[in-house]
From Swiss-Prot:
GO biological process, one term: translation
SUPFAM superfamilies: Nucleic acid-binding proteins (SSF50249)
Keywords, sorted A to Z: Ribonucleoprotein, Ribosomal protein, RNA-binding, rRNA-binding
CDD domains named among the record's database cross-references: Ribosomal_S23 (cd03367)
Presence of keyword Cell inner membrane: no
Entry protein name: Small ribosomal subunit protein uS12
Signal peptide positions (record): none
Pfam hit, one: Ribosom_S12_S23
Source species: Methanosphaera stadtmanae (strain ATCC 43021 / DSM 3091 / JCM 11832 / MCB-3)
Length: 141
């Protein structure tokens, strides 16, 4: 046991050893926000550059329909998944889309789609899910 007046030494040691913890270090230095294309925000708008098909990981065999999007706020390019049956048909190049996280573990990719961490929620300010279900038609810009 340390001495009677050793509280400062104990506290300083704890603080120094916390820097060995990866999660603490990343949080304190803001490394996760620096590396995040959305810069810490929950959603972002972007312009569709191209449509891409991404092969699902084993044991599944499918081509997941995704889009390459250039974010308006910082110009970074990301790949976003288009959820829903036939959803890719409602998205054209140069459309403005709203992107949000796909909901995977620890903010990472979900399921069998490798390297895709975002999904498309709106196309030209209209919900993609509404267009897929047939409730709303895509507006002509």
């Amino acid at each position: 046991m340390p001495g009677l007046f050793a509280a400062k030494k104990l506290k300083d040691n704890r603080q120094n050893f916390r820097w060995k913890d990866t999660q603490y270090k990343r949080k304190t230095l803001g490394l996760n926000i620096k590396a995040d294309p959305l810069e810490g925000s929950p959603q972002a708008r972007g312009i569709v550059i191209e449509k891409v098909g991404i092969e699902a990981k084993q044991p599944n065999s499918a081509i997941r329909k995704c889009v390459r999007v250039q974010l308006i706020k910082n110009g970074k390019q990301i790949t976003a998944f288009a959820p829903g049956d036939g959803a890719i048909g409602f998205i054209d190049e140069h459309d403005e889309v709203m992107i949000e996280g796909i909901g995977g573990p620890s903010g990472r990719s979900m399921g069998d789609i490798p390297g895709v961490r975002w999904k498309v929620t709106k196309v030209n300010n209209v919900a993609l899910s509404e267009m897929v279900s047939g409730k709303i038609e895509k507006p002509v810009r």
